[in-house]
A protein has these predicted regions:
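Short, surface-exposed ligand-recognition loops at beta-strand->loop->(often short) alpha-helix junctions
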Residues: 1, 204-212, 252-253, 297-307, ...
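N-terminal accessory segments
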Residues: 1-26, 42-57, 344-367, 371-376
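Short amphipathic alpha-helices in soluble, non-transmembrane regions
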Residues: 8-9, 42-43, 215-220, 256-267, ...
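Glycine-rich N-terminal segment of FAD-binding domains in flavoprotein oxidoreductases
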Residues: 19-81, 85-111
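Conserved glycine-rich FAD pyrophosphate-binding loop
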Residues: 61-72, 116, 268-404
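FAD-binding subdomain of flavoenzyme oxidoreductases
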Residues: 111-112, 116-225
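A conserved active-site cap/scaffold subdomain adjacent to cofactor or substrate pockets
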Residues: 215-272
Length: 404
């Protein structure tokens, strides 16, 4: 049976587009939306289950599947419209490649996602992973105008487009953002761009954690909002103390004004980085957790950071911690047993803080789930959505987890 399916895949995609991964799992590399759809129709007909991949840095290779479907063949930057500040790209385009192309037109995608530079744009959107710039430019969903996706049974859906539209009913584009591939394979994305800032300045300050969070509240109360205000644990910054990093971006005059307000308001000894050191620092911050066994994000408001930081310290190892000091949000990277993650999720839920398991070995993902337990009434809705977009459960994605 498996040889017959592989032969049909080779006939469909070409021999060079079907191989095996290091563990012997068949891997398909379709190069168009139509090819992805045809692959999934064949897989659905054959009863196979599918593991979705970009460049393979986010999905665990031990996820049990009959086929690994990678978007690496979807690597074209389709259109870039500087006048409209919009780009259309395929999901397999690496983020560093997109950055270089947009810079040619003095534009950028205002995202600094964690992970390796070659992470695909599709994986960033599917996991909704954002870095420090989320505080100033918004989460991943704010940068995605529309998309093309393919369902588990091979149907092509195209919600949204290259302009912002107000549409009654459910926002299908936002459903795909952060859905971890449970609702379809992203193949094409329409992205909102920005002009490159004329000035980009980073300030660093070192102090005890409680003092830094207090200063962040002072800045917020004073209406000072840099594009990033990130609280970093010693393990992230390779320092002996916690660090607060403030990043101001925009016109030269606007940045100068923001810097002056920060220095006037914040009771800290700030150190301004030159361009080269700032680039190296943010590269370190973005990629510090790439080798961690698992990463977790918590949707905490800035006012609740101190309490959540204490909870994380009590129930997980010290790990690496990134926290949005002005707008909230926290990420942790390290290693933890499933029962410790469940305990933290339960305690966070009591405080109205969602916990998302971003990355982990498959056994942990399956036990804990990306989202875990839902509020009353939400679980059945998610199950119904999965039935719509993956009616025969072809995608290997653990959203809810399995209780012990």
């Amino acid at each position: 049976m498996s040889h017959d399916v592989l032969d049909r895949l080779r006939s469909l995609l070409g021999p060079a587009s079907v191989s095996r991964d290091p563990d012997g799992v068949p891997r398909a590399v379709p190069d168009s939306t139509d090819a992805v759809a045809a692959t999934l129709r064949l897989v659905d007909e054959s009863g196979w289950r599918v593991r979705l991949e970009g460049h393979g840095s986010w999905v665990p290779p031990d996820a049990s599947a009959d086929l690994a479907l990678t978007t690496r063949g979807l690597d074209r930057i389709v259109t870039v419209h500087p006048a409209d500040l919009v780009a259309t790209v395929e999901a397999g385009v690496p983020m560093d490649v997109l950055r270089r192309r947009l810079a040619d037109d003095r534009m950028w995608l205002a995202l600094d996602p964690p992970g390796r530079p070659e992470r695909t744009v599709g994986s960033i959107v599917a996991t909704a992973t954002a870095g420090a710039l989320r505080g100033g430019f918004g989460p991943v969903r704010d940068h995605v105008l529309g998309c093309t996706a393919v369902t588990g049974d091979g149907r092509v859906i195209r919600p949204g487009g290259t302009v912002v539209k107000n549409v009654a009913g459910y926002d299908l584009t936002k459903l795909q953002v952060g859905g971890f591939g449970a609702f379809g394979v992203l193949t094409t994305l329409h992205l909102r761009l920005r002009a490159l800032p004329a000035a980009d300045v980073t300030l660093l300050a070192r102090a005890p954690r409680d003092h830094l969070t207090s200063v962040a509240r002072d800045l917020a109360d004073a209406g000072v909002q840099p594009q990033a205000l990130e609280l970093l644990s010693p393990a992230v910054s390779a320092e002996s103390e916690w660090i607060m990093a403030a990043r101001c971006m925009g016109s030269a005059g606007g940045v100068a004004g923001d810097l002056a307000r920060i220095l006037d308001t914040a009771d800290l000894a700030w150190n301004e980085l030159d361009v080269e050191r700032a680039h190296a620092f943010w590269h370190l911050v973005t990629h510090a957790g790439s080798g961690a066994a698992m990463t977790v994000r918590l949707g905490v408001l800035a006012a609740g950071l101190d309490e959540l930081l204490d909870l994380v310290g009590q129930h997980l190892d010290e790990g690496l911690i990134w926290a949005g000091a002005s707008q909230g949000g926290m990420r942790w990277a390290g290693d933890a047993a499933p029962e410790h993650l469940r305990t933290l999720r339960h305690l966070a839920a009591e405080r109205e803080v969602p916990l998302t398991l971003e990355r982990a070995p498959w056994a942990v993902r399956r036990a804990v789930g990306h989202f875990g337990a839902y509020r009353e009434g939400v679980g059945p809705l998610v199950a119904q959505l999965r039935e719509v977009f993956d009616p025969t459960s072809r995608f290997v994605v653990a959203l809810g987890g399995v209780e012990p």
